Each structure stands twice: as structure tokens, then as C-alpha cells.
Amino acid sequence: RDWSSDVCSSDLLEAFNYLTRLVESGEAQLISDINSKEMIEQNPYQSHLTGMFYKGKQGKPLAVVVPGGGFISNVTDCEGYPVAMKLHKLGYSVLVISYPIGKQLGETEHEKQGQAAVRELVQVIRYLKEHEQELSVDMDDYAIFGFSAGGMMTTAYSFANYEDCCHKVKLPRPKVIFPMYGLDWNVKALEQDKGLAVFSIAGREDEYGFGNVEKRLPQLKSVLGEDNVSVRIYDNLGHGFGIGSNTIVPHWFEEAVEFWEAHRK
């Protein structure tokens, strides 16, 4: 992915400046104790699990933002902070997570690294549940925005057909998920998944194959309900379009927020 491209750079500086102002005014803070001191002592790499928390308006829900990077990097600059800025400007609380990658996950094989990364997301949700009052968030009413690898993590946490899903770890499921160019193309909805709403966009030209999720849509819609699945596959769209600036989907974010609000009720 060419992260220096126009798709990303125009949003990046504004997002960093916005975050800097929030940190200075006390409206944003780095959370570095998601894993306990004991866990970090046992495995120092676990100190790499952190979150930048943006405090939103009272009564507005929380968005957890999970950037991608193929489990070899964290693309927070493109898929984290610009998204968080847009959400926070609308009043939402936001947690942008940065998670261990590569050998830090304790695995060498790519698929196992992905599974280990899902367990990092589990730990984030556990932390949020334990700190609801302190952070003024309601974990019965939250969403996850995941991009690329982060979208795979979001899928695997939210759907019951995965090993480390919310049901199995007994943690709250998001009301709505947004696995952008990241909805697992093998996803399968089970009865337990009823009540979950899914919004996703991918391109047919996606070089990692995320457009292949199209074949799963009839099954998803039959279980979750037509109104709860907004997944679109576009021609002439590749991977890694971030917030969508200068692409054929410049308004996906506004559509996503509309979908979220419609499914909070």
C-alpha cells in the first residue's frame, strides 16, 4: 500500500493537529495499562497494546477503531486518527488502538498472528468493560470500525463462528461493526449473531481479495436480516482507501454514521 498517496496525506496533518489540541486540553489521553503490569512483566511485548482515547459528549456512544497493517504494522496514521477525528467532531467517544504485531504476537505463521491479534482486541474490550464508569462509556451501546487486518479482527470478535468471539469470552458484542475492506470473505452468520448490524465496503480490485465477501452476502442477510447488512463491493476500487478522500467512495463515512445511528435503537 502506498500510504504517502493522496488518499491519506490530506487527512493526516489535520488529524494529528486535532489530536494534539485535544491532548493539550485534556480531552484525549493515551491508555497504556490495557494489559496489567503482571502480564507485561511476563511478556514485555504486551506493553505494545495501547489506545488513544478521545472523550466524547455525554449520551453519545463509543467507537473502537482498529487500524490495519497486515499484522506487520499499525496503520494508525491513515486508518486511525483521521477516522477518530471525524467521529469525535460528531460527539462520539473514540478509542484508537495500537496492538502488537509480527513476532510480538508470539506467532510466526500469518493466520496464527491474526488469531493472536484478535485476542488483543478481546483484551481491549475487557479493559473498556472494566473501566466503563471512569471513561464514561456504555459497553451495551458501542461500535467497532476495523480496517483491513483490523476488519478481520473485528469480524472474528463479533461473529459467533470464531474461536475468540465475544460470546465465548463473555464480553459485550458491538451493536454495529464496520469492517472496511476487512470483512472476512469466509464469514458465516449463526443464530447467535442475530441483532448484529454490519456495514462494509470493499473493491473488486482489492489485491487481498476482500471483494470475495460478495458471495457470503445472501447467507449474512438471511440470518441477520436485509436491513442489518449494508455491504457493497465496488468496481474500480482497490485496497486501503482509508477515509475515502480522492476515491470513488468519498462519502462512505457519512453513510456509515447514518447506518450506525439507525441501528442503535
List where the protein language model places each region.
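Active-site glycine-rich loops that stabilize anionic/oxyanionic intermediates
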Residues: P67-I72, R204
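Short beta-strand element of the alpha/beta-hydrolase
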Residues: K60-G68
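Catalytic nucleophile-loop/oxyanion-hole region of alpha/beta-hydrolase
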Residues: V75, P100-L135, N246-V249
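C-terminal catalytic histidine-bearing segment of alpha/beta-hydrolase fold enzymes
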Residues: G225-K265
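Primarily recognizes the serine-hydrolase "nucleophile elbow" in alpha/beta-hydrolase
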Residues: R119-D193
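Short amphipathic alpha-helix adjacent to the substrate-entry channel of hydrolases
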Residues: D77-L95
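Short, small-residue-biased leader/transition segments that mark boundaries at the very start
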Residues: D2-S9
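The feature captures the conserved acid-bearing segment of alpha/beta-hydrolase catalytic domains
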Residues: K168-E226, S230
